[in-house]
Amino acid sequence: MRSVSLRGLEAEARERLDHAVYDFFAGAAEDETTMRANEAAYARIGLVPRVLRGCGAPELGVSLLGRRLETPVLVAPTAFHRLAHPDGECATARACAAAGTVMIAAMASTVPIAEIVAAGRERAPDSPAPWFQLYIQPDLDFTGAIVGRAEAAGCGALVLSADSPALGHRERDLRNAFHDLPDGLRCENMRAPGPGAVQARPRSFQFSPELSWAHMDWLRER
């Protein structure tokens, strides 16, 4: 049966995906209190229609950072899409391009950012380019190289994740012994820069409580 809602897609994913993979996508840190609170907060939001306005067909499009979007709903960054689909983030980019909205590509993508951007352009050349999520790494030279790749790929913006001074204590992942990607999958954007970058083993993510406004100044100036 074809899913017609987000809840339906979630149920279908639970049936199709490996249990540990589903828990990775569906889970959060500790007791998942914040995740449940977020869902409850969104559920309390109501859309109150205006009546007798004579406005014709509704128009959902918006202008964002100088680009036209067909919907004000963006796709947030999520890691490791190839765990769920063989084309990984490229499939997500094509879907977002077809919908006329922005995909925010995760720094922990299983496809290089240049290929993600190219996949969206191939599907819909005039669609808004993906944005790139960034975790500033302690090695600022390496971080700068990652930002340079996103710029060269044509990303429309950087989305800085500043709320992760440490890796979350994800209890579902711990129970499932989900500590790393399976063989053949890598965080492609974390490869070392240089001529041998494609062959180089990706670096591990590093989270630091040292992140401050000084890092924002560095990012703006580079």
Protein language model regions, located:
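An N-cap/entry alpha-helix motif that binds or orients negatively charged groups
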Residues: 1-69, 170, 177-211
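A short, Lys/Arg-enriched amphipathic alpha-helix followed by its capping loop at the start of a domain
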Residues: 71-73, 92-101
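Hydrophobic faces of well-ordered beta-strands that scaffold small-molecule active sites
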Residues: 73-76, 101-105, 130-134, 158
